[in-house]
Structures are given as structure tokens and as C-alpha cells.
Amino acid sequence: MGFDGYAPRSEPLISSSSLKRMAGTATYVYCIVQRSARPRVTRGPSGLGDASIPRLVDIEKGLWMVCADVPLASYGAASIERGLRDLDWVSRVAIAHEAVVERFTKVSGATVIPMKLFTIFSNDERACEEMRSRRRDLGGIFRRIKGCQEWGVRITRRALALPKPQRSASASGSAFLAEKKRARDAVLQQSQQVVRAADETLRALGRLARETRRREPLEAATTPPVLDAAFLVPLLRRARFKSAATRAASMCVDAGAELVLTGPWPAYHFIHSGDSAA
């Protein structure tokens, strides 16, 4: 899935000039965890390459950062700028980042806000200071996603198998054109059925979700999906949601489409406030 997360502020977290004055390492933040008691850090994902093992840092009572020390030789501004041109490197970093975030979402009683890739501060103290300054913003996010998981639904139209109109010596021009029209009408009818199935899926699953967001189609996608949506689903409704998704998948097959359900994920698409999908 496409990675998203919380960014504490809009400008770069560490400027190039600041990095030049810093020695050795910086603090990389994976996520923020809210829980009544400190989570236990047991064996889990090792995190980014060249980084220290993920650790917890206290922000305030009931709130922790999951962070690591990263070498500026690998994660300084210039290094990251070069790395962003290498899609394989970005993919490896994203997978490692998400593995740490997802490990903490599995901790009982924890609510987790994933951070954007490359959320880096000069040190732990500076990171804590920034998070405390955003406490009101973070509190709103925690209230929105608490007790929920993100599930994704993607619906794509299947290719309609139609015989290619053949122009033969015995066939009249009008018969050939009529055959082409029947093929066009069949494709149009299927498209309309798929759109109706996608709309009904969005409504049915949306009724079980706390919030729904449409996701931006991937740039590399050759066939844009008819529906690509994320659903913020309360844990208590998870079984009902999955059952409804199974019924929707069957409806989509009948309409000539395929529904793919993914999840559960951390609430990547619900970190920022926004209107639910219509």
C-alpha cells in the first residue's frame, strides 16, 4: 500500500545547514504510541538499515515515541535527496519503517500514529519538544483512530471477453457495424454494472466504518480502479465488515469486476482530518 503518515510540520524537519553542524547521528521517529502503561519492547523488526534498534522515548504520561539513532552519513539531507531518486532504496526504507509501526499496532491497548518517512530531529529532546508542541493536534488524531484499524478495498473492472467483429465477403457492411455496436453496448453495460456495484460497496462498507477515504490511484497503475478506498473500522465491527466485504466481492464478480480486500493496517489514511468519501 502507499505509505502515508503524520508530519509534525510542513517545512523540512532538519535543514541542510543544521545537519552540517550536527555530529554523527540524529533521531529518527517511526511512530507515536498512546497507552495506559508503557509498552514492552521485545524482539521485533530491526528497523532501517544502519539505524540503532528501535526504542521508546517518553513524551509525557501515557505517550511515547518509537525512535532510533540514524547516521547522518546515510540519513542526512544530501543522502536522503540522493536516495529519493532510487526507488528500490525508498521501497526498502518504507518497508522497514512500516514493519516497526505495524509491530506496535499489535500491542494490546495501544493506539499508534505512524510518522511520515524521514521524520528526523537533531536529538531525542528536540523530537519530544516538537511532539509536545503538537499535543492538541495529536490528541485529535488519537481520538479519531482509537480502537480502529484501517482496511483497504480496491475494485477493478475485468476485461470483457468479446469476439472481435470480422468483416467477411459474405457479411454486409450493416451487419458488421451492428456487431460492433453490440460489442460497444456490452462494454458500456458492464461498465455501468461495475460502477453500481462499486457505489453499493462503498455505501455498505461505509456504514460499518467510522470514516471512509478514497485513495489516490497509483501512478504506475495501467488500469485505474473503479474504487480505491480506505475504511477506518472499529475493532468491534471487524467481523461484520469482513463479512460485508465478502458479500460485496460476490456482487462485484457478478457485475464483471474484482474486489480485493487488504488489511488490517495502521490508520495511515486517517491521520489527517478530511471529508469522508461520498
Predicted regions and their residues:
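N-terminal amphipathic/basic-hydrophobic helices that include classical n-h-c signal peptides
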Residues: 1-21
